Amino acid sequence: MKLCGFEAGLDQPFFLIAGPCTAESEQLCLDVAGHMKEVCARLGINYIFKASYDKANRSSGKSVRGLGLEEGLRIFSEVQRQIGVPVLTDVHTIEDIPAVAAVVDVLQTPAFLCRQTDFIHAVATCGKPVNIKKGQFLAPGDMKNVVDKAREVNNGADNIMVCERGASFGYNNLVSDMRSLAIMRETGCPVVFDATHSVQLPGGQGTTSGGQREFVPVLARAAIAVGISGLFMETHPCPEKAWSDGPNSWPLDRMESLLATLVALDKAVKTAGFEELK
């Protein structure tokens, strides 16, 4: 799959989607995008910046949602112009899709909306690559149905990625079944692993979600070892002060050391090949 000017697939080095959960300010987005661009250039990683203009599925109605569509898109345009990196953001309503697709390079669908047929149809026909997140409630094999919905309407465009972000495991907890990454390859789409939302504890702090940040590198290494096309990580210079998902965000100043390990592991795994595919 051609993605933001590079090839994405299991036969390529993994690409990275990374940034703060919420676009808290223009300066934060520029700082994170600039830092990650430099890190990824040193490590030879294709990089896509991510942030959200609206967190429409917060645990509590009193939680901060974001700066909104207009300001968010203005900030994303500045990231593209000043930093020179592609931008991904998530859309939560069909009405937002045209405006978002006119600005950003990649659209993402929230996990909770992966079975909403009209929504999937709308985002699949927006003319941009789409990262479809697997719902926490969905079996990995069921993502084929989701991808089939997208392909029904996108005129054969090779623009769909699928993303694993953990599965519900009792109340307020998620678990990552690494088999799902191999199973989701059967969709024929590049598979992305979300290493930070996978350690989230949904609603675990009452009115907000908790998280187990210490397990981010554990799951990231495991996913790379299985074999993936892309890695998704939320990062923040001060996770404790992040507007959202701070407990499961990886500190910005620790990204390079973790990514260096993952690059070496990715190279070793892909050089050796995958026995299950032989």
UniProtKB/Swiss-Prot annotation:
Question: Which species is this UniProt entry from?
Answer: Dechloromonas aromatica (strain RCB)
* Protein name according to UniProt: 2-dehydro-3-deoxyphosphooctonate aldolase
Q: What class of enzyme is it?
A: transferase
Task: Note whether Cytoplasm occurs among the keywords.
Answer: yes
The terms describing its cellular component in GO are: cytoplasm
- According to its UniProt record, the EC number is 2.5.1.55
One Pfam family for this entry, by name?
DAHP_synth_1
Q: Which GO terms describe its molecular function?
A: 3-deoxy-8-phosphooctulonate synthase activity
Per UniProt, the keywords (alphabetical) are: Cytoplasm, Lipopolysaccharide biosynthesis, Transferase
Main site of residence? cytoplasm
